[in-house]
């Protein structure tokens, strides 16, 4: 071929490609179906803040097909109304804007001036009230509400002075015919400490049928916030009489006011911890519990300790559940909206957090913003709100999510869509609106359309704060597609964007060949140019379209690109356009009818590349008469349809070239597959898993020969390497993905000719996640598109399993800070008298380090840390100050700390002991730091149910919240005293007191009392029944009633724990104090209390080092009953027995006496406590984990690792059993991880049920380590900060050293691929702390005669000095002769001092 012909062909190729690129630009120029050139703009006077709030209003006749009454309600809160209202300036206005007349008319919601009382005194101020700051409409009603949250009401003091209370007010109207005022906070509850600053109307919402009006008042009660539910048709007096609440005293209505639906409901005041929470900042209505009745979601952006909270209530303000944010200061709940995003018919909740900042960004970005999309769904009530999607903003300071609105189904695909406003986003910070489309799985990952302020008009100035207000979901122009309204209050402009009809196109293109092969020898076509015979094939393309509001016919621009993978050297061309592989055409389709085009394509005479498939690409788009420039405004232009761009608009199909294979043109290859690899692979090894593959063809050519390997999901494909000296067979592979069922496909020749081989090796590496199988199961296959000879396929498939070798070594170490310390007990106080932490004793920090010293990862391990929090007789010993500080991949269960609410040292609380010791390098890795006294918090999105029974998939379900606590009588009396001081004008100390209360945690938030009626016998059996009395709170968070709880147990006595704490079984262990001992576990009852002081923890005895062995001789128990002891006894006293007895039987009422003997000290200290128990010992060996009949005594050995099994029931007659069954999560059985997934009866090893304590009662802290690797950064650390109670140490050992230790027991619970290990892997480590009292200072003794002699000498010297002074006349008094000095007045420089 000549050079000119080659040049012409390349030019012919270049021109169509350019046309194709221009076509693609035209397709994306106007975005999707929110049309920009046809927008409608409304303006008002400058600085009126026109567009601050907007709401689409359907009106009485505004349904699809009749748009005469569909309008847009726009608020302008600084609009000057002095022409309409006498004596009022900038009261604000509300406008009704219509597409029909292109104008906005002022709606006379409030046309009167300031109100006056009977004495003609002005009682309110409407100037600057910001009417129009909030507007809302009913979805299926003609009700409209407009609010003025800065409206001021004046209440009169006894001295006739004005009070200025910004109570706020709202106005309602049905279709703008009559207007009524609703001001729920205009009462006698003046002052910001009550409802004087409530700013009612800061937010408002109307349910779908217009039967309920919701008004938010975020300023009530020190800005805790409040929400009202009001019947909109009721008429209310100007102000309720006396101190009655809103909704009483003269309410007039045409309905029965005794019915609940005609009454006013509101949330009540909460505890001071919820001050400045702003409940009522935003709200939206919807069915959030599936009862087909609309509820209301209320924003509380500063609630939940500043992370934000959404309170979801029913129409009568009964709480359903709450949702808490994740990040402090993100303003979670600033904006709210609902939309059926996944198309399941349920309302999904959209939550805006415009102040969200990514803490991991390194670019200094802040206020990026975030939107949370919570999908309502799930098979059970607990999983209704467990699906969450997050969409983050894109630019710093953009405040993505400041405005939200539903769009309905804007593109006609059956899924709800929504818009997100970012009013400070964009190239110049003028604002951007993002459009998101729904799908069956939730919102699409990326916005379907982005509308920037700079795209709106033909040049500057562009509007600012574009997207500050949004409204959508209604069809404004009558084409059945909902439209979008956007407010830009800084520019006093509002825009309405119309939606274009969407055509859903179904299209396909394919070659007319079932085998997808074309033979070069089949030359059935002839070229016109040179009459050559060429191989050819038929290409068929079909289209059809459907959709709403579409014309009967549509024109489409279509194009084809042949051999798309080889644009520079194409091999396939159109027969009608010889030498061209690109074709453009315009077609006309009829609505709902399928239209097909057939084109004959041919191949070149000589094809060098026979391996690359021949691929065709077909594209289509609607033909448009509109110019491509989107900046030109075409306001009155007809909205042309647009294709659904969520569908595939590029169609593809491919065929392969077939070689000649004999006279029958049928090739029968014979592929042989051989694979070699290891039998066992070490998990965690740095070397990859290598698989060597050898494929040979011993018969005819194999077309599209391929190798398939189904890989386990836990392995990742790394690389493929060809082997052998001759690499004449190219190999290309597509990596395994979930979409192709984790199948690696390698093309090994097209064709793989006879006698050729493919020899290569594949490298695989494990992923970070771990499967549940103990081996890697592989399936290999080699095949081709042409079938082999029957009977020869047996060597084409291989199945093989590669075992997984897991090698781990759990190691635990620890240190004490300090490990030795001198103390002086006189410098400290009793714990009951202490007020701050350093009053009770010296601080000690125990740090544990958990490592893995072998290559395989430990997927999960449990660590139990036992610390002696009190002696066996109940004296506090080691006082826990904080939640454990953790570093690495470890989490610890919450444990009660600082139970006496001592004032903690802030520096010590904030200090990271792990970082100080070099365990971690970044303070962000530290967790567990808390300064509260009895609880810990987090910043994660969770849902709190009004009635719950545990945890659901990481979503907390609780039955009470801080924001709904009812005021106690003491708090009510405090409020009354504050009101008195406020009225007298002296309330400064009230403000300080409230501020201090707001930052303190309450000691006790709720209590649970459990009563049991039991019938028991001497064997300890019984059938107890219990009623758990839940508390009921009144307010905006929870309205719960009593909860019935019934449980049964095989014990006659057991403890019931609070429902929100980890359930643990409490036992009093009477164990030995020496090298071996015997004790029978006994259970007892108690009252459970949540928050504040709580001693409900697992008890037992702990070896206290030298205290146990060197300084304590005995522990005596005096029994009012019988005792038999074949071993040695202590003394001859009847009823006494020694604690280290090997066996014995005891019963009755006991008193415990502790006796200590120390050199140089004579004395006895007694502790008394009463415990009823009865039992008979059996046998138990700690280190071999064996049991014998009866209950569980303990044999202990010094310095030996300890672990125990689960507290299984052993119901032998005459013995105790501590297991129980319960109908809820609250019971006496300790929570544990269950590895018995397949229902096996074998119980896993449990090391936490019976603490290895021997001489003290222990508190057990459970921690879970995950993914413990071998790298330096994989180690896990736990630091426990406590203080030793000096007074208790003095009682135990007043002048000798005292050794106290904590013990950590680690147990591997989960290994990768294996699960729970068959043999227990338990490691222990004990940290010792030695405390020694300071030695007493013995003063030097002075002889008595020296003292007497010194006293006599001093007396003589004193008498001599007196005598000398007397002789000198010191004791004689001489008065002055001149008395003039005494008559001078005492002026001191001031008039009037003469009378002093």
Swiss-Prot record:
Signal peptide range in chain numbering: 1-31
Tissue: In ovaries, highly expressed in follicle cells. At syncytial blastoderm stage, expressed in the embryonic mesodermal precursors but not in the ectoderm. At embryonic stages 7 and 10, expression is restricted to the mesoderm. At stage 12, expressed in the gonadal sheath and the interstitial cells of the gonad. In stage 16 embryos, expressed in the somatic and visceral muscles where localizes to sites of attachment between adjacent muscles. In third larval instar wing imaginal disk, expressed in the ventral compartment and in a subset of adepithelial and peripodial cells (at protein level).
Region annotated Disordered, chain positions: 960-1107, 1159-1246, 1377-1396
Membrane topology value: Single-pass type I membrane protein
GO cellular component: apical plasma membrane; basal plasma membrane; external side of plasma membrane; focal adhesion; integrin complex; lateral plasma membrane; plasma membrane; sarcolemma
Transmembrane stretches, start-end: 1342-1366
GO molecular function annotation: extracellular matrix binding; integrin binding; protein heterodimerization activity
Matches recorded under PROSITE patterns: FG_GAP, INTEGRIN_ALPHA
Residues in compartment: Cytoplasmic: 1367-1396
Topological domain spans for side Extracellular: 32-1341
Glycosylation site list: 69, 209, 322, 584, 598, 741, 783, 833, 959, 1005, 1299, 1307
Biased composition (Basic and acidic residues): 963-979
Subunit organization: Heterodimer of an alpha and a beta subunit. The alpha subunit is composed of a heavy and a light chain linked by a disulfide bond. Alpha-PS2 associates with beta-PS.
PANTHER family tied to this protein: INTEGRIN ALPHA, INTEGRIN ALPHA-PS2
This protein's name: Integrin alpha-PS2
Species this chain originates from: Drosophila melanogaster (Fruit fly)
């Amino acid at each position: 071929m000549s050079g000119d012909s080659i040049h012409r062909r390349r030019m012919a190729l270049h021109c169509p490609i350019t046309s194709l690129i221009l076509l693609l630009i035209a397709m994306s120029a106007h975005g999707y179906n929110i049309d920009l050139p046809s927008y409608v703009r409304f303006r008002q006077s400058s600085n009126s803040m026109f567009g601050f709030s907007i709401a689409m209003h359907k009106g009485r006749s505004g349904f699809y097909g009749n748009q005469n009454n569909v309008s847009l309600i726009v608020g302008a809160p600084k609009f000057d109304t002095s022409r309409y209202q006498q004596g009022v300036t900038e009261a604000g206005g509300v406008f009704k804007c219509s597409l029909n007349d292109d104008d906005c008319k002022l709606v006379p919601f409030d046309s009167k001036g300031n109100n006056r009382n009977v004495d003609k005194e002005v009682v309110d101020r409407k100037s600057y009230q910001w009417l129009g700051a909030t507007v809302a409409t009913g979805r299926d009603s003609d009700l409209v509400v407009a609010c003025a949250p800065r409206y001021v009401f004046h209440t009169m003091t006894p001295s006739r002075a004005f009070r200025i209370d910004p109570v706020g007010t709202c106005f309602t109207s049905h279709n703008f015919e009559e207007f009524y005022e609703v001001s729920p906070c205009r009462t006698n509850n003046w002052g910001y400490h009550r409802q004087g600053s409530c700013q009612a109307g800061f937010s408002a919402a109307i349910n779908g049928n217009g039967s309920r009006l919701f008004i938010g008042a975020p300023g009530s009660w020190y800005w805790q916030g409040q929400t009202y539910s009001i019947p909109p048709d009721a008429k209310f007096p100007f102000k309720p009489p006396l101190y009655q609440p809103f909704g009483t005293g003269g309410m007039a209505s045409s309905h029965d006011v005794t019915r609940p639906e005609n009454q006013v409901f509101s949330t009540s005041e909460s505890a001071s911890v919820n001050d400045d929470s702003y409940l009522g900042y935003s709200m939206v209505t919807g069915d959030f519990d599936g009862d087909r009745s609309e509820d209301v979601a209320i924003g509380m952006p500063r609630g939940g300790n500043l992370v934000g909270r959404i309170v979801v209530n029913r129409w009568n303000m009964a709480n359903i559940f709450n949702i808490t944010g994740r990040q402090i200061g993100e303003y979670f709940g600033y904006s709210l909206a609902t939309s059926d995003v996944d198309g399941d018919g349920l309302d999904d909740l959209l939550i805006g957090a415009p102040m969200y900042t990514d803490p991991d960004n390194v670019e200094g970005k802040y206020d990026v913003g975030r939107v949370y999309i919570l999908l309502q769904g799930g098979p059970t009530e607990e999983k209704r709100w467990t699906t969450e999607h997050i969409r983050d903003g894109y630019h710093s300071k953009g405040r993505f999510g400041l405005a939200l609105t539903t769009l309905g189904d804007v593109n006609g695909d059956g899924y709800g869509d929504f818009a997100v406003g970012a009013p400070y986003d964009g190239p110049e910070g003028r604002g951007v609106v993002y459009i998101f489309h729904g799908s069956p799985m939730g919102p699409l990952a990326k916005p379907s359309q982005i509308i920037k302020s700079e795209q709106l008009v033909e040049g500057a100035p562009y509007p600012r704060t574009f997207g500050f207000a949004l409204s959508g979901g209604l069809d404004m122009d009558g084409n059945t597609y909902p439209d979008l309204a956007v407010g830009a209050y800084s520019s006093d402009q509002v825009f309405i964007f119309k939606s274009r009809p969407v055509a859903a196109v179904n299209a396909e293109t394919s070659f007319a060949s079932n085998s997808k092969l074309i033979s070069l020898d089949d030359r059935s076509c002839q070229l016109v140019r040179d009459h050559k015979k060429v191989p050819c094939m038929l290409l068929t393309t079909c289209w059809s379209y459907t959709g709403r509001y579409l014309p009967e016919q549509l024109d489409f621009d279509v194009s084809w690109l042949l051999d798309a993978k080889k644009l520079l050297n194409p091999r396939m061309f159109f027969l009608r356009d010889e030498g061209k592989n690109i074709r453009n055409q315009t077609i006309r389709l009829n609505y709902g009818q399928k239209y097909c085009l057939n084109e004959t394509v041919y191949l070149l005479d000589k094809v060098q590349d026979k391996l690359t498939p021949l691929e065709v690409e077909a594209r289509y788009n609607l033909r448009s008469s509109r110019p491509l420039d989107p900046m030109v405004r075409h306001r009155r232009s007809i909205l042309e349809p647009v294709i659904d761009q969520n569908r595939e608009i590029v169609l593809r199909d491919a065929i392969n070239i077939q070689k000649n294979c004999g006279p029958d043109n049928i090739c029968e290859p014979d592929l042989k597959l051989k694979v070699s690899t290891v039998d066992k692979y070490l998990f965690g090894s740095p070397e990859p898993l290598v698989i060597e593959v050898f494929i040979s063809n011993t018969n005819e050519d194999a077309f599209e020969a391929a190798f398939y390997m189904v890989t386990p999901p836990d392995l990742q494909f790394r690389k493929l390497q060809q082997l052998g000296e001759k690499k004449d067979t190219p190999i290309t592979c597509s990596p395994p993905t979930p979409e192709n069922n984790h199948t690696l496909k390698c093309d090994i020749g097209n064709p793989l000719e006879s006698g050729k081989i493919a020899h290569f090796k594949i490298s695989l590496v494990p992923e970070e996640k771990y499967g549940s199988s103990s081996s890697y199961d592989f399936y290999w296959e080699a095949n081709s598109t042409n079938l082999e000879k029957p009977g020869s396929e047996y060597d084409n498939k291989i199945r093989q399993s590669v075992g997984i070798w897991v090698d781990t070594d759990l190691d635990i170490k620890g240190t004490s800070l300090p490990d030795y310390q001198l103390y002086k007990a006189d410098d400290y106080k009793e714990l009951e008298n202490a007020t701050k932490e350093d009053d009770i004793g010296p601080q000690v920090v125990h740090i544990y380090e958990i490592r893995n010293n072998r290559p395989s990862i430990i997927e999960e391990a449990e660590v139990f840390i036992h610390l002696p929090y009190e002696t066996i007789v109940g004296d506090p010993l080691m006082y826990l100050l904080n939640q454990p500080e953790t570093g690495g991949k470890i989490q610890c269960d919450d444990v009660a700390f600082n139970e006496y609410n001592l004032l903690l040292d802030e520096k010590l609380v904030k200090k990271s002991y792990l970082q100080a010791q070099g365990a971690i390098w970044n303070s962000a890795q530290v967790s567990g730091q808390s300064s509260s006294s009895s609880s810990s918090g987090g910043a994660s999105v969770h849902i709190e149910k009004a009635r719950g029974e545990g945890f659901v998939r990481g979503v907390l379900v609780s039955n009470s919240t801080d924001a709904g606590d009812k005021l106690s009588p003491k708090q009510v009396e405090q409020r009354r005293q504050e009101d008195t001081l406020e009225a007298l004008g002296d309330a400064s100390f009230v403000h300080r007191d409230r501020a201090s209360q707001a930052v303190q945690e309450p000691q006790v938030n709720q209590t649970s009392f459990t009563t049991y009626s039991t019938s028991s016998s001497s064997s300890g059996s019984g059938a107890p029944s219990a009623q758990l009395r839940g508390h009921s709170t009144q307010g905006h968070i929870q309205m719960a009633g009593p909860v019935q709880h019934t449980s049964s147990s095989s014990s006659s006595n057991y403890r019931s724990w609070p429902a929100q704490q980890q359930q643990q079984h409490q036992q009093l262990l009477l164990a030995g104090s020496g090298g071996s001992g015997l004790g029978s576990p006994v259970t007892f009852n108690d009252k459970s209390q949540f928050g504040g002081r709580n001693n409900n923890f697992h008890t037992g005895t702990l070896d206290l080092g030298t205290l146990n062995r060197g300084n304590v001789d005995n522990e005596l128990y005096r029994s009012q009953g019988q005792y038999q002891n074949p071993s040695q006894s202590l003394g001859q006293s009847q009823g006494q027995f020694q604690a280290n007895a090997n066996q014995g039987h005891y019963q009755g009422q006991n008193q415990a006496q502790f006796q200590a003997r120390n050199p140089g000290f004579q004395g006895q200290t007694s502790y008394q406590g009463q415990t009823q128990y009865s039992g008979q010992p059996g046998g138990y060996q700690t280190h071999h984990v064996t049991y014998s009949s009866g209950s569980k005594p303990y044999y202990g050995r010094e310095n030996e690792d300890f672990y125990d099994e689960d507290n299984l029931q052993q119901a032998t007659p005459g013995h105790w059993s501590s297991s129980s069954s319960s109908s809820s999560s609250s019971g006496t059985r300790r929570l544990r991880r269950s590895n018995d997934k397949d229902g096996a009866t074998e119980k896993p090893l449990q090391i936490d049920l019976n603490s290895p304590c021997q001489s003290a009662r222990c508190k057990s802290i459970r921690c879970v380590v995950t993914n413990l690797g071998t790298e330096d950064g994989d180690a896990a650390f736990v630091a426990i900060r406590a203080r030793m109670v000096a007074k208790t140490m003095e009682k135990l050992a007043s002048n000798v050293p005292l050794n106290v230790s904590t013990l950590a027991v680690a147990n591997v619970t989960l290994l990768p691929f294996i699960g729970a290990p068959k043999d227990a892997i338990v490691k222990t480590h004990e940290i010792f702390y030695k405390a020694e009292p300071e030695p007493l200072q013995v003063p030097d003794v002075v002889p008595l005669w020296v003292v007497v002699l010194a006293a006599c000498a001093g007396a003589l010297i004193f008498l001599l000095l007196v005598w000398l002074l007397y002789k000198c006349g010191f004791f004689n008094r001489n008065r002055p002769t001149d008395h003039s000095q005494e008559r001078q007045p005492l002026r001191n420089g001031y008039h009037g001092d003469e009378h002093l």
